[in-house]
C-alpha cells in the first residue's frame, strides 16, 4: 500500500496529521526529517506532508528536508513550519511575525485551488511565531492576512502549504483541504475494515510454522490482535491472561467469560504475589511501568516451561499512540514508557508480533466489529496494562488496591450508560492525607480523583462535562461507602498538556 509520509518536525499536532489523512481515506505514517530522497522514492509515497514544529525555517540550525526530495516529483504539502520550509526552499521569504498567533483566526480565501466548496471566510487554528511574507516566484497565493501569506501552491498544484493547522478540529474545513490535495494524485486506499485479510496474511507470513504466545489483557486491543492471529495460525496461538493483582473488581472473571465466548483458548496465570512483591517500595511512575514490564516477561519465561514447544513470538496489542508516547516513532520524544513498548526487557526471549501497532483505537474498534466481536467488548473503556498500579500515586499495597477497586467500581457503575465517555480513570492520591469531618469528629483520609474524558484516538482529549447531579451521586457514594476516602476531586485538564492517565 502506497503511504502518505508525514515528516515530523516536532509539532504537538503531528499525530493528528496522520489521523486526519487516514480519515480522508489514505494510509499515512511518520517519516524522519533525515529521510533521504532515495529512501522516499523506495517507499513510492502518494505525497509527503511536512508537519509544524517549534523551529524557525530561516535559521541555520533549523531542521531541513533533503533538497533532492523537491526534485523527485512527489507532491508535497506543508503545514505551519512545513509551509514556511517550502517558502524558504523555493525562494520565498520567512521572518519573525510582528505578533505571534495562537488559537482561532479568521482567514479569507482568494483562490479556490484546494478550497472548492468552502466559504471564502472561515475560522482556522493558528500556532506560529514566524510568517511567510513573500511567496516563492511563480507560486499562486491562495489566502493572505494584512502582512503575511497564509497559503500558496505552485502552478501545477503539486507543491502547496498552509500557515494554519488543517488537522485540528478547530479548523472546520481542514480535512476538506487535505482531501482535496490528495485526491488530485490518487484515489483513497485506506479503510481499516478492509485491512483484515491483509493483516491475517501478514501474520501468517511473519509467523510461518512457529508458535505464538499472546499476552491477553482482555481489552479490545489484545482481543482483536488475538482474533486476527487465531484466524491466521489457528491453534498455534496460545493465549495467557496474567492476573497481576492490579485488576479492577471482578475483572478476571469477566475476561475469562467473554474470551471463552469468542472461542479463544485462554489460560489464566495468577502472578499477583510476584507483581506486588516487585512493586514494594516503588513510588516513581516510570519505575512502576518498567518493573511491571519486566515481571510480565518473567511470567512468560516461566510459562514457557509448560509448553511442549516453546512459542517463538509474543503477541501484543500495541497501538500507534503507544509508539508515539514511548518515543518509538521517527524523531519522537518519550512521554511515558508503556509496559508493552519501552517497559519490555531487551532480552525478551521472544520476537514481538504487533499487528496493530500502526492503528489508532477507533480503527481497531472498526476491525473488531467487522470480526464479529460483541459491541460491549469492542467499546469497553481502555484500561492500562499496568492496571491500578499507575492509578495509585505512591507505593502500591493490597490495602490501597482494595480502596481503589471499590471507588472505581462505583464510578463505573454510575457511568455505565455514558457510552460517549472515552475513558474515566479513577486515581487514588495515596501520598496525601486530607482532613474531613464524619459525624462530629475530625477524620483523615485519601482524596480520589475522577477523570472522565472524551476523545477520538487518545492522542488528544478533553474533560467530559458530566452533569452536577451525576458528580454529586458519585461523590456521595464514594465518601459514604468507602471510609478511607474523605474527598473526591474532578480533573478538568485536557490532553495536552496532561496525559489521560496520571502516571
From Swiss-Prot:
- Enzyme Commission code: 6.3.5.2
Q: Name one GO cellular component term.
A: cytosol
Give the GO molecular function terms.
ATP binding; GMP synthase activity
Q: Where is the GMPS ATP-PPase domain?
A: 190-380
The record's catalysed reaction(s) read:
XMP + L-glutamine + ATP + H2O = GMP + L-glutamate + AMP + diphosphate + 2 H(+)
* Glutamine amidotransferase type-1 domain residues: 3-189
A Pfam family hit = GATase
User: Which UniProt keywords are given for this protein, alphabetically ordered?
Assistant: ATP-binding, Glutamine amidotransferase, GMP biosynthesis, Ligase, Nucleotide-binding, Purine biosynthesis
**Chain sites annotated for binding ATP:** 217-223
The protein's matches in InterPro entries, at most eight in alphabetical order, are given as: Class_I_gatase-like, GATASE, GMP_synth_C, GMP_synth_GATase, GMP_synthase, GMPS_ATP_PPase_dom, NAD/GMP_synthase, Rossmann-like_a/b/a_fold
**Its biological function?**
Catalyzes the synthesis of GMP from XMP.
Quote the subunit structure annotation.
Homodimer.
Could you identify this protein by its name?
Answer: GMP synthase [glutamine-hydrolyzing]
Name the source organism: Tropheryma whipplei (strain TW08/27)
Gene behind the chain: guaA
Amino acid at each position: 500500500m502506497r503511504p502518505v509520509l508525514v515528516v515530523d518536525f516536532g509539532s504537538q499536532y503531528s499525530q493528528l496529521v496522520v489521523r486526519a489523512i487516514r480519515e480522508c481515506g489514505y494510509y499515512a505514517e511518520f517519516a524522519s526529517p533525515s529521510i533521504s530522497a532515495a529512501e522516499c522514492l523506495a517507499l513510492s509515497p502518494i505525497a509527503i506532508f511536512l508537519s509544524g514544529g517549534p523551529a524557525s525555517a530561516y535559521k541555520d540550525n533549523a531542521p531541513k528536508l533533503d533538497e533532492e526530495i523537491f526534485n523527485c516529483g512527489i507532491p508535497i504539502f506543508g503545514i505551519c513550519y512545513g509551509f514556511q520550509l517550502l517558502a524558504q526552499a523555493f525562494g520565498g521569504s520567512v521572518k519573525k511575525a510582528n505578533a505571534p498567533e495562537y488559537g482561532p483566526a479568521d482567514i479569507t480565501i482568494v483562490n479556490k485551488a484546494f478550497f472548492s466548496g468552502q466559504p471564502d471566510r472561515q475560522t482556522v487554528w493558528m500556532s506560529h511565531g514566524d510568517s511567510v511574507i513573500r511567496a516563492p516566484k511563480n507560486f499562486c497565493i491562495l489566502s493572505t492576512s494584512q502582512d503575511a501569506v497564509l497559503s500558496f501552491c505552485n502552478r501545477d498544484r503539486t507543491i502547496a502549504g498552509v500557515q494554519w493547522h488543517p488537522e485540528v478540529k478547530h479548523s472546520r474545513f481542514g480535512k476538506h483541504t487535505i482531501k482535496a490535495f490528495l485526491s488530485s494524485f490518487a484515489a483513497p486506499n485506506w479503510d481499516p475494515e478492509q485491512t483484515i485479510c491483509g493483516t491475517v496474511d501478514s501474520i501468517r507470513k511473519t509467523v510461518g510454522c512457529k508458535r505464538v504466545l499472546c499476552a491477553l489483557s482482555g481489552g479490545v486491543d489484545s482481543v482483536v490482535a488475538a482474533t486476527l492471529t487465531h484466524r491466521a495460525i489457528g491453534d498455534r496461538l496460545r493465549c495467557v491472561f496474567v492476573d497481576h493483582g492490579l485488576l479492577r473488581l471482578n475483572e478476571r472473571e469477566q475476561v475469562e467469560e467473554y474470551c471463552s465466548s469468542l472461542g479463544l483458548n485462554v489460560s489464566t496465570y495468577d502472578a499477583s504475589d510476584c507483581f506486588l512483591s516487585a512493586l514494594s517500595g516503588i513510588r516513581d511512575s516510570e519505575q512502576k511501568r518498567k518493573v511491571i514490564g519486566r515481571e510480565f516477561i518473567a511470567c512468560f519465561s516461566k510459562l514457557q516451561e509448560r509448553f511442549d514447544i516453546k512459542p517463538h513470538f509474543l503477541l501484543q496489542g500495541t497501538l500507534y499512540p503507544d509508539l508515539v508516547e514511548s518515543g518509538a516513532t521517527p524523531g519522537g520524544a518519550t512521554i511515558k514508557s508503556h509496559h508493552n513498548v519501552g517497559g519490555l526487557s531487551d532480552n525478551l526471549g521472544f520476537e514481538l508480533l504487533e499487528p496493530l501497532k500502526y492503528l489508532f483505537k477507533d480503527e481497531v474498534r472498526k476491525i473488531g466489529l467487522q470480526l464479529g466481536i460483541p459491541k460491549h467488548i469492542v467499546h469497553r473503556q481502555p484500561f492500562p496494562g499496568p492496571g491500578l498500579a499507575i492509578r495509585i500515586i505512591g507505593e502500591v499495597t493490597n490495602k490501597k488496591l482494595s480502596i481503589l477497586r471499590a471507588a472505581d467500581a462505583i464510578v463505573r457503575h454510575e457511568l455505565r450508560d455514558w457510552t460517549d465517555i472515552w475513558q474515566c480513570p479513577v486515581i487514588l492520591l495515596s501520598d496525601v492525607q486530607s482532613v474531613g469531618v464524619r459525624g462530629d469528629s475530625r477524620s483523615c483520609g485519601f482524596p480520589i480523583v475522577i477523570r472522565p474524558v472524551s476523545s477520538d484516538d487518545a492522542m488528544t482529549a478533553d474533560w467530559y462535562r458530566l452533569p452536577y447531579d451525576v458528580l454529586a451521586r458519585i461523590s456521595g457514594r464514594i465518601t459514604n461507602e468507602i471510609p478511607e476516602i474523605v474527598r473526591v476531586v474532578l480533573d478538568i485538564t485536557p490532553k495536552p498538556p496532561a496525559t489521560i492517565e496520571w502516571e
